């Protein structure tokens, strides 16, 4: 079964949108090489990284719902997450997270 992915690019403080876009383009190529289809992409900017999800809880929940609405099997995030953040994403999104 071919998986369908939602990619999330996050512009952190100190990084510009063009850099995030470039990293998202690279991520798209890597995911496609793995045989995973890209169903949806989102680029977000955050002012301050949050401990639980990197994004705020409401925004993370919104991204999970958006992935479901686009029939995505997996969410791929272009930033490093702490082990706790990854676990929180996996629990919230039913283990459908790649970092």
Regions found by a protein language model. Give the residues of each.
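N-terminal accessory targeting/assembly segments
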Residues: 1-99
């Amino acid at each position: 079964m071919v998986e369908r992915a939602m990619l999330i690019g996050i512009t952190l403080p100190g990084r510009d949108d063009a850099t995030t876009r470039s990293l998202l383009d690279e991520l798209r190529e890597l995911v496609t090489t793995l045989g995973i289809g890209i169903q949806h992409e989102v680029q977000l900017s955050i002012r301050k990284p949050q401990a639980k999800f990197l994004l705020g809880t409401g925004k993370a929940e919104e991204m999970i719902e958006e992935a479901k609405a686009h029939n995505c099997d997996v969410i791929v995030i272009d930033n490093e997450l702490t082990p706790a953040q990854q676990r929180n994403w996996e629990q919230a999104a039913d283990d459908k997270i790649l970092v």
